[in-house]
């Protein structure tokens, strides 16, 4: 009886760990890189869906985006051009 409880507990903890890892790491990274690739080519429905997913997976976007900064940002180029 005790070993069955322990094995069930490990299964539940493992399932929570996998779901948490997907929610906090894998899906936000996928969305971030997808948006970097498709940013200038998205239609309005794709953009709306992505914004909804970003809102859903928001907790780690602040953390992840602080490490992955875009290299070719149009906003940065415009600021660099305006400052000269």
Swiss-Prot record:
Enzyme class: translocase
Compartments in which it is found: Cellular thylakoid membrane
Sample GO molecular function, one term: quinone binding
Its EC number(s): 7.1.1.-
Alphabetical list of Pfam families matching this protein: NdhL
Catalytic activity: a plastoquinone + NADH + (n+1) H(+)(in) = a plastoquinol + NAD(+) + n H(+)(out); a plastoquinone + NADPH + (n+1) H(+)(in) = a plastoquinol + NADP(+) + n H(+)(out)
Membrane topology annotation: Multi-pass membrane protein
Main location: membrane
Transmembrane residue ranges: 10-30, 48-68
Keyword annotations from UniProtKB, A to Z: Membrane, NAD, NADP, Plastoquinone, Quinone, Thylakoid, Translocase, Transmembrane, Transmembrane helix, Transport
Cellular compartments per GO CC: plasma membrane-derived thylakoid membrane
HAMAP family (UniProt xref): NDH1_NDH1L (MF_01355)
Subunit structure: NDH-1 can be composed of about 15 different subunits; different subcomplexes with different compositions have been identified which probably have different functions.
Function noted in UniProt: NDH-1 shuttles electrons from an unknown electron donor, via FMN and iron-sulfur (Fe-S) centers, to quinones in the respiratory and/or the photosynthetic chain. The immediate electron acceptor for the enzyme in this species is believed to be plastoquinone. Couples the redox reaction to proton translocation, and thus conserves the redox energy in a proton gradient. Cyanobacterial NDH-1 also plays a role in inorganic carbon-concentration.
Family: Belongs to the complex I NdhL subunit family.
Protein's UniProt name: NAD(P)H-quinone oxidoreductase subunit L
The species this protein was found in: Prochlorococcus marinus (strain MIT 9211)
Gene this chain is encoded by: ndhL
